[in-house]
Amino acid sequence: MENVPDYHGKAATGQAYERAMAELGFSSSLGGEAMERRKEVPATVPIHPCPGTISIETGAARQYGADVKTDNRSAFGNALEDVGKLNYGELGKTPLLVFDCDLAGSVKTDGFARSCPKWFKEMGIQEHSTATVAGAASCGGVVSLWADFGVFGLDEVYNQQRLNDINGTNLKVVLTHVGLDVGEDGMTHQCIDYAGLLRNTFGWKLVVPADPNQTDRATRWAIRTPGNICLAMGRSKLPVLTDEKGAPLFGEDYKFQYGKADLVREGSHGTIICMGHMVHRGVKAWETLVAQGIRPRLLHVSCPLETDEEALEAAVRTGAILTYEDHHSGTGLASSIAMRLAERGETVRFKGMGVHRYGDSGTSDDVIARMGLSSADLVMTFKQLLAR
């Protein structure tokens, strides 16, 4: 069989099989036994998640005030370092291994690296290997977390993450620099398809937090929750999201709940559903619409792979739904909401606003505006939807 390409993906038979098994030191009867066992395999083979109980302290959430403006990746890094310090060297605590591919400063895992050096694994520019090693490590009694740019941590290594799903690993992937928000890095580095890629799997959970406060809580939740979980966030600094009274929306009493939509502003003249950092432009558009006598309901969806049925029902009752996202409009939030509406048999005016081509290179605001996704574009499109 050596040096014969015919055997790529093809099993040896007859005398070739007998010789191969003898050379390997196995009985040739194993082949027949395997064929018999196949007859007994159920139609659906269950996935068995990696064994083990997570014993890790995630601590109290940091609180970012209404006057704070910072990036979600820094909030993630701060929360990660907090958790590391609470557990590093503590007997009986599940180790938290953090993997990096030469980007610790950009993805904000450098603080963790300084505080917990033995738990920090620098892999170099080896994304495929890192996805595999981090997934495998999570089945060995540790919590694995890998932070990288969106195009490297998911687009580049999609098959490895698909195999992590098949193998039931316990990996936490944090994607920074996603969407058009990356701006100057241009179309090659603007990850605009992460929700669609993870929707192709059956076990991955996805969280796209709105601001630093929600990012902090989602990070701590992901670390202590079994299973494969992805957090996705942009690069830009964001204001803390507030309620109508000016208090942080995700304040001290807020607890992250996977799949729960966030009510940002009350209203009844249609519903605007935002994902991730776009909710900040959504608030600006909402204020403009209210000044013009239109008061829509404003929602934020941080978990686009999981529908909040109660929130969707309330949105339908307003008579019009517009989704707003920094993501491929055909595979992200819009498609998720539209499919669920169709499955429920709902009749409602609907429009999806999202990325519809590869982006340009420039400031985040300029690139988003050139895609027709500015807050002014949102106001205009929403008014057109109501007029239909």
Question: Model-derived features: where do they sit?
Answer:
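Thiamine diphosphate
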Residues: 1-232, 236-238, 242, 251, ...
